Design a protein with these regions (language model features):
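Non-transmembrane, aqueous-exposed alpha-helical and coiled segments at domain scale
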Residues: 1-418
Length: 418
C-alpha cells in the first residue's frame, strides 16, 4: 500500500490536477481533503480538457473511487453541474462524499461578494464563491453538514438556527443585502440540487480503511499551494483552509494517515492569482502570460507572472514535507532569453518575512542559460537540451529534494519521469 499526497509548493495553479490525473491510473482512490469551488484543477486527457473544481482529478479512472472529504466545503448545485459535465464526456463517476463535509450555500457566496464590495481597494481578491463564510460558519458551529441532506427535519432546523444568527448581522453590515428565502425553501432547494449525488453521502473513513486493509494506493489531492495556507501562507491573502500535506489525513477522513510520498508541485516559473506579493514579478508579463496560458481556472483572471522564486518554493517544499518535486510547464520557458532564478531576497526581515514586510523585499537573481529548441516531444530527461537539464538540476540543488517529474506539455505522455 502507498499513500501519495499531491500538494502545491507555491500559491496554487501549479498543475496539481494533471499530476493527480497521471498518477490516478494506478490508484484505487483519489481524495480531495480541503477547499471547495474556489480553485480549479485543469486536466487534459483523451476525453478532452476539464476544469475541475470540487471533483478529485482521479475521477477519470473508472476503477478509482473519487472521495470528497470532511475537510471540504461543498457547493451542492455546482457539484451536480460538474458531475453532469464529466458524465456527458463519457465518465462514470464512482464517488463517496463525506457526511461531515460542510455545505457552501448561495447565501455564503452572496455574503462573500458583499464583503469584497465593502472592502473596496482593501479586498482580499476572493473568488466570491462563499468559501470563507462557509468555513467561518463551521468554526462558529453554525455550518450545515452534508450529512443533514439525508435528515430533512434536522436540515430545516439547522438552517433556521444558522439564519436566525446570520441574517441580522448581514442586514446590519450590508445596506443592500436582500434575502427572502425561508429555511424550508432553502432545504427544498438543497434536496433538489443534491439529488444526483445524495446517495453517495457516507462516512468516507469506512471505504478508505477498507482500501488500506487491501494494500491499495490512495491518492490525496490538495487545492492551492503552501503560500495560500491559512496558517503558513501570506496572511491575510490566504485561503480559508489548511493546504499543507499534514492536513491530508484530517481532511480526508483518515486522521492517522502517514503518507509514504508527498509530491510538491511547482511550476518552472512563478505565477499567482489574487491579492498578495509576487516578489519576482516580471516587468513585461502579457506576452509570457498568453504563451503559458496563465489565467485562473475558476475566475479567468490573468495571473501575475514572475521568475522562479527558489526562496518561496523551498519554503513551500519544506512546509509540505515533500519527498519529491514535480516541475511543470518547463516547455513554456523555451525561447525565454531573460531566464533567471531568484536565489535570495534583499531587505529587512528577508529570512522569515510576513506581510507587509514581503512587499519591501527585492529579489536576488542568478542568471541561467536559455534554450530555443521545442521540448514538447522529449520523453526522457536526457533528450532535453543541456541548458534545460541544467535549469532543472539547479532547481533541484536549491530545493534539496529530488525533481522526479518534469512536465513538457499538458498531455499524460508529456510527463518525464526521472
Amino acid at each position: 500500500m502507498s499513500s501519495i499526497v499531491v500538494v502545491g509548493a507555491n500559491w496554487g495553479d501549479e498543475g496539481k490536477g494533471r499530476i493527480v490525473d497521471f498518477l490516478a491510473e494506478q490508484a484505487s482512490a483519489s481524495i480531495r481533503f480541503q477547499g471547495g469551488n474556489n480553485a480549479g484543477h485543469t486536466v487534459v486527457n483523451d476525453l478532452g480538457t476539464f476544469k475541475l473544481h470540487q471533483l478529485p482529478s482521479g475521477v477519470f479512472n473508472p476503477d478509482c473511487l473519487a472521495v470528497l472529504g470532511p475537510g471540504m466545503v461543498i457547493s451542492p448545485a455546482l457539484l451536480s453541474q460538474e458531475i453532469a459535465e464529466v458524465e456527458e464526456a463519457g465518465v462514470k463517476v464512482n464517488m463517496c462524499i463525506s457526511d461531515r463535509a460542510t455545505l457552501c450555500l448561495p447565501l455564503h457566496a452572496l455574503e462573500d461578494m458583499l464583503e469584497e464590495q465593502r472592502l473596496g481597494d482593501k479586498a482580499y481578491g476572493s473568488t466570491r464563491q462563499g468559501i470563507a463564510p462557509a468555513y467561518g460558519d463551521r468554526v462558529m458551529k453554525k455550518g450545515i453538514l452534508v450529512g443533514w441532506l439525508k435528515q430533512p427535519e434536522v436540515l430545516v432546523e439547522r438552517l433556521q438556527f444558522m439564519m436566525d444568527w446570520k441574517l441580522p448581522q448581514l442586514r446590519a453590515l450590508y445596506p443592500t443585502f436582500e434575502f427572502e428565502q425561508t429555511a424550508e425553501e432553502m432545504a427544498n432547494w438543497l434536496l433538489e440540487v443534491s439529488a444526483p449525488w445524495r446517495d453517495s453521502i457516507c462516512n468516507v473513513t469506512l471505504p478508505l480503511k477498507e482500501l488500506q486493509a487491501k494494500d491499495k494506493t490512495l491518492l490525496f489531492e490538495a487545492q492551492l499551494g503552501a503560500g495560500r495556507d491559512l496558517v503558513y501562507g501570506e496572511y491575510p491573502w490566504t485561503t480559508s483552509s489548511n493546504v499543507v500535506s499534514m492536513y491530508a489525513g484530517i481532511g480526508s477522513g483518515l486522521p492517522a494517515l502517514r503518507p509514504e510520498r508527498v509530491i510538491a508541485v511547482a511550476k518552472a516559473f512563478s505565477s499567482s492569482v489574487g491579492t498578495g506579493t509576487l516578489i519576482t514579478a516580471m516587468e513585461e508579463q502579457d506576452a509570457f502570460r498568453e504563451l503559458a496560458g496563465e489565467f485562473g481556472a475558476t475566475t479567468g483572471r490573468p495571473r501575475d507572472m514572475g521568475y522562479f522564486d527558489a526562496v518561496a518554493t523551498k519554503n513551500g517544499v519544506e512546509l509540505q514535507a515533500a519527498t519529491e518535486i514535480a516541475l511543470t510547464k518547463v516547455d513554456c520557458l523555451t525561447g525565454l532569453n531573460d531566464l533567471k532564478i531568484c536565489v535570495g531576497y534583499e531587505g529587512d526581515h528577508s529570512e522569515n518575512p510576513i506581510w507587509p514586510q514581503t512587499a519591501a523585499l527585492a529579489p536576488i537573481y542568478e542568471k541561467m542559460e536559455s534554450w530555443s529548441e521545442d521540448i514538447t516531444g522529449c520523453r526522457k530527461f536526457e533528450e532535453l537540451p543541456v541548458t534545460a537539464q541544467k535549469y532543472v538540476l539547479r532547481i533541484e540543488e536549491l530545493m534539496g529534494v529530488p525533481v522526479k517529474m518534469v512536465s513538457v506539455g499538458p498531455g499524460r505522455e508529456q510527463m518525464i519521469m526521472r
